[in-house]
Amino acid sequence: MALVKEQAIESIHTMHVLIEKVFSGKHAEQDLPALIDHFAEHFEMVGAAGKRITLQEVSNLFSQNQGKMPDIQIEIYDEQVLLQTEHAIVLTYTEKHTKASGVLIRRSCGLLEEINGKMKWSYLQETFLA
């Protein structure tokens, strides 16, 4: 299975819809496992504050914050594919979180890989913009 640019960009949106549902508490029981399934077992990220985070830590973050941001809205825009091979895509996008407490905007760069015939997120780097 070769990775397709449009599917990679759609994955950004699908994943962030699930994140918004989980954080807002407006999610179904299957949404958290579906969200975690987007990530490769070896996934790691560097969050916007500069901390290195493993898949287990990301999973814990989602589990522990279910319903704790009822007013969160996540908007994704400026998606660009930087590099594409048959089995990997590097892309960037801007992510805007709006809550009653304020707005956070970050620019992210992610690596998606084909693993066992599925598109999985392997790496993510976030940088605060505002």
Task: Give the location of each predicted region.
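A beta-strand edge to alpha-helix "cap/lid" segment located at domain peripheries
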Residues: 2-11, 17-29, 44-130
